[in-house]
Amino acid sequence: MKQQVEVKELKEGKYVLADDEPCVIKSIQKSKPGKHGSAKARIEAIGIFDGQKRSIISSVSAKTYVPIVERKSAQVLSISSNIAQLMDMETYTTFELTIPEDYKDRVTEGKDITYIEAMGKMKIDLR
């Protein structure tokens, strides 16, 4: 799911689609309009799921896509090596996600955790 917004409405910490990948905006620089052109914006963003740094250069009045990112809660049913079986607390559906290396000690069976869902992808997110 995604929606279209103008580049001038984007802010740091919000989300944007760069190369069809949902990203968190880290910085935005806007240049002033010149004699023969409109103002431009340079957006630096980091992918939510892959961690890659991406940059977008676009006119401030142009439209871009913003992903709809949902934070949901789930309960850990079981853990086998680096894969956790989770149950969504609202819909009670079960699914499996890989546990990131830095969260391995914090994800235990029976515990409630938060996960991110955007553009058909999911990721465990413990903040």
Swiss-Prot record:
Domain of life: Archaea
UniProt cross-references to InterPro entries, sorted A to Z: IF5A-like (IPR001884), IF5A-like_N (IPR048670), NA-bd_OB-fold (IPR012340), Rib_uL2_dom2 (IPR014722), Trans_elong_IF5A_hypusine_site (IPR019769), Transl_elong_IF5A_arc (IPR022847), Transl_elong_IF5A_C (IPR020189), Translation_prot_SH3-like_sf (IPR008991)
Compartment(s): Cytoplasm
Pfam family, one: eIF-5a
Cellular compartments per GO CC: cytoplasm
Alphabetical UniProt keywords: Cytoplasm, Hypusine, Initiation factor, Protein biosynthesis
One of the GO biological process terms: positive regulation of translational termination
Protein role: Functions by promoting the formation of the first peptide bond.
Name of the protein in its database record: Translation initiation factor 5A
Organism of provenance: Methanococcoides burtonii (strain DSM 6242 / NBRC 107633 / OCM 468 / ACE-M)
Gene: eif5a
